[in-house]
Each structure stands twice: as C-alpha cells, then as structure tokens.
Design a protein with these regions (language model features):
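Short, contiguous strand/loop micro-motifs
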Residues: 27-30, 58-60
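Short, flexible, solvent-exposed loop/turn segments with mixed acidic/basic and small polar residues
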Residues: 14-25, 49-57
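Ordered hydrophobic segments in well-structured contexts
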Residues: 13-14, 32, 63-65
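Short, compact, well-ordered microdomains
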Residues: 46-95
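Charged, low-complexity intrinsically disordered tails and linkers
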Residues: 1-21
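Short Gly/charged-rich anion-binding patches and loops
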Residues: 39-40, 70
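Short, surface-exposed ligand-recognition loops at beta-strand->loop->(often short) alpha-helix junctions
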Residues: 31-37
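Intrinsically disordered, low-complexity proline/glycine-rich segments
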Residues: 7-8, 31, 42, 46, ...
C-alpha cells in the first residue's frame, strides 16, 4: 500500500525521501508522517512534542515533516529507522 493510500485510510504512515532546503543546512532527508484522521495525527505528534500547528495540510494528505535529530529520534522509537538508513547508505552516490 502506498503512503497516500495509508494516509487516506486514516493510518499513521511514514514516507522518507531526499530533501534539501537552505533553511536547514545538513539535512538531506525528510520524513512525512501523515494521517487523514487529524485527531489521531495530533495525538500521535503530541507524544513527540510536535505541535498541531506544525501539520502541513498541503494537498489532501495532512502530515508532519520530520528532519534532523528529531527525525532520527522519532524514527528510532517508531521502529522505522531502516527507512532513514537506506538514504544514508546511498548518500555517497548523491554527490
């Protein structure tokens, strides 16, 4: 099932991809954590100190954007660190 399908079904879904933004030097990836059930997404984010106003409502897939140390900590606690490590292994090919 794709990330968009999982989000649409009201599941907490993770999607990590390459991302570079000059505002966040040193960050090469972002993890989108989405869920169409906004209350569920807010409750999920609260346990990690994420504020409801940080939810990105762009397109039809509400989500938090995780990056940097916060991304690594949350991905570790959620048992999803493999998504992040995949990109770290490939970073030498991105030069």
């Amino acid at each position: 099932m794709s990330w968009k399908e999982a989000v649409s079904r009201g599941e907490i879904a993770f999607l990590t991809h390459y991302w570079v933004d000059q505002r966040f030097p040193g960050c090469k990836t972002v993890t989108k954590v989405g869920c169409s059930d906004i209350e569920r997404l807010i409750m999920w984010g609260t346990q990690y100190g994420l504020k409801p106003e940080w939810i990105d409502y762009k397109e039809a897939y509400p989500h938090f954007d995780l990056f940097g140390q916060h991304q690594r900590m949350i991905m570790t606690k959620e048992g999803k660190l493999d998504q992040l490590k995949r990109f770290e292994k490939n970073k030498s090919t991105m030069s």
